[in-house]
Amino acid sequence: MSLLHSILLGLVQGVAEFLPISSSGHLAIVEQILGVKGAAEVPGFFDVLLHLGTLAAVFVAYWPEIWEMIQEFFRGISDLIHGTTPTPVPPARRMILLVIVGTLPLFAILGIKDWIESLSSNLYVVGGALIVTGCLLFTSDRVRKGRKNEHSARMTDALIVGAAQALATCPGLSRSGTTISVGCFLGFERKFAVRYSFIMSIPAVLGANILSLKDALGGEVIWKDVPVYLLGVLVAAIVGYACIRLLKMIADKGKFGAFAYYC
C-alpha cells in the first residue's frame, strides 16, 4: 500500500466514522476505486487499525464523561459489595447501564458476521444502504425535539437504539447516523443522542476489532507496510476528533438533514 492510499483511507475513515455517512460504505467504495484490496487482503488488517484510530478520537473527545463512568463503575461495585443503592442513581451509572443494554443486540448477529462483512464487496448493497441512511437522517430532522437524556432515557430505549446499531453493521448503513436518528425518534435530546451514540460505539468497536483481528492476522500481512498503516491511523484519529467536534456543534442546532442529501 502506498503512503497516499494510507492517508486517503485514514481521511475517509476519520470523516465517515463520525459524520453520519457510513465509514464502512465509503471504505468499501474507495478501496474498490483504488484497487488496494488484493489477494493478500491487506486492508483487512488496515481496517482494524483505522477503527482503533477513530476509537482513540472518541476517548479524547469524551474523556471527562468516560472517566466519570469508569469511576462510577468502581463505585457501583463498592455499593454492590456493601449492599447500598444511591438515590437517585448517578447519571454516569445510568449511562453505563444504557451502554451495556444498548450493546446486547450485537450478540444476536455474531453468527452472521462473515456474511455481513461479505456484503461490502457488493456496491449495490452499499449504495442502497447509504440511501436508507439518508432517509433516516432526513426524517430525524422533522421529528419534535426530545428531552430524554441519561437521567430519563429508559432501558427499552437503549435496547431499541442497540438494535439499530446491530442493523447498522450492514456496509453502507451509518452506525452513527442510524443510532442518532433512532435516538431522535425515541425522544432523545439531540446532544444526548450524539453523545450516547459515540460512547456506545466503544464496546462495539472494541468487540468487532477483537473478532476481526484474528482473521486479519491469519492472512498474509505485509509487516514492512505497518509504518505506512500507522500514518493512516494517525490521520484517522486527528480527522475523527475534528469531526466529533463538528457534529457536536451541528447537534446544538439539531440539523442533520444536510448529510441526508449527501448520502
Predicted ranges, named:
Residues 1-263:
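Multi-pass membrane proteins that catalyze or facilitate reactions on polyprenyl-/lipid-phosphate substrates
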